[in-house]
């Protein structure tokens, strides 16, 4: 996405990938495109200020629409489909909180409404007390196909792409930077944009951690015959911490994710567990039991596959986008949090504008030293 936006700005760029394109976290993504931010709008306003929080939510809301435009532009066959989304609670003490949250979102132009158990319980087979049902601002996508189509489109537009190319050394400068590959080739650039997700944490080992790490789990079911008890097969998320999310696929399967485990030690068991680790299996089975309980009218919910991955989160649920004082000549586009794909799009847009000399003031919202 960053290379795409640089190309759109008329900037000459080279894309370098240590592994294979569309592997690693892209292949493991559940690919929920949703404007939702973990803290919710009201809590985020109390942390970063009313204007910044509103802008952050609207950025995500608009990014879903912008992603659909990119899909059309590159003619991608990636199953992009708009979906409504439902954030709910089963806690009766949170009725007023959810009502206020819904009003705050409506006030900035988000098309949502408050669902209560009295008005809409018959549209869902699981119990809830109250929830915010958003009619727009969410979608599902095939991330691997989208990435492949995006790369192919940009290569045709002149972007150079090198995969299986590991950068092992660098000399960053505000004037010109040099990157050195494992094969001892050099790349000279006016600006370097680091978009390496979890791997980018290596750049900040000397700092006090500004993030938290966890391992998140997901189960993909085999196709089911229907989505009874599931209004519009919307994207569903509860208000727990960690939360559980559920989405359909276009092949009538279900993806359920959550049951996150915190990582306190990078050398510990949770940080390095394999796919068949007993604790991982426990989390998968818990997710499967949960989706069966929530949708008793959907018969024969069976596992097709499961997977887990590392998840990087931030204190306010927002990404880190922009410059860092320790690395002149570089920008970071780090979509940490629950909206990795949308945050990456937002970062790509803002950074490309900044490099092109347009100085977008919105970068202030996502800067490194904001807390």
Give a label for each model feature.
Residues 285-371:
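C-terminal catalytic lobe of FAD-dependent flavoproteins
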Residues 36-117:
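Dinucleotide-binding Rossmann-like beta1-alpha1 core, especially the glycine-rich loop
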């Amino acid at each position: 996405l960053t290379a795409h936006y640089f190309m759109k700005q008329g900037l000459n760029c080279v894309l370098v990938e240590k592994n294979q394109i569309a592997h690693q976290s892209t292949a493991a993504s559940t690919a929920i495109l949703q404007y939702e931010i973990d803290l919710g709008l009201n809590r985020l306003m109390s942390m970063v200020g009313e204007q910044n929080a509103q802008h952050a939510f609207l950025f995500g809301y608009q990014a879903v629409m912008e992603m659909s435009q990119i899909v059309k532009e590159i003619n991608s066959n990636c199953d992009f489909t708009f979906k409504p989304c439902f954030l709910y609670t089963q806690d009766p003490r949170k009725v007023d909180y959810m009502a206020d949250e819904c009003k705050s979102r409506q006030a900035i132009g988000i098309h949502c409404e408050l669902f209560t158990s009295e008005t809409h319980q018959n549209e869902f087979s699981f119990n809830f007390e109250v929830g915010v049902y958003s009619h727009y601002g969410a979608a599902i996508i095939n991330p691997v196909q989208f990435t492949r189509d995006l790369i192919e489109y940009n290569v045709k537009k002149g972007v150079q792409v090198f995969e299986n190319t590991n950068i092992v050394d660098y000399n960053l400068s505000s004037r010109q930077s040099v990157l050195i590959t494992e094969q001892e080739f050099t790349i000279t650039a006016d600006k370097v944009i680091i978009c390496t997700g979890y791997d980018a944490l290596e750049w900040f080992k000397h700092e006090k951690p500004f993030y938290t790490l966890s391992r998140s789990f997901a189960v993909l079911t085999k196709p089911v015959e229907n989505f009874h008890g599931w209004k519009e097969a919307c994207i569903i998320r509860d208000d727990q911490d960690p939360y559980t999310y559920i989405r359909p696929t276009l092949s009538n399967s279900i993806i359920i994710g959550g049951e996150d485990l915190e990582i306190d030690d990078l050398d510990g068991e949770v940080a390095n567990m394999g796919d068949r680790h007993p604790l991982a299996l426990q989390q998968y089975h818990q997710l499967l039991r949960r989706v069966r309980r929530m949708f008793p009218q959907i018969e024969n919910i069976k596992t097709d596959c499961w997977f887990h991955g590392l998840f990087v989160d931030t204190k306010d649920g927002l990404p880190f986008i922009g410059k860092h004082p320790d690395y002149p000549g570089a920008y970071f586009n780090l979509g940490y949090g629950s909206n990795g794909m949308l945050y990456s799009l937002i970062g790509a847009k803002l950074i490309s504008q900044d490099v092109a000399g347009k100085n977008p003031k919105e970068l202030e919202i996502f800067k490194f030293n904001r807390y």
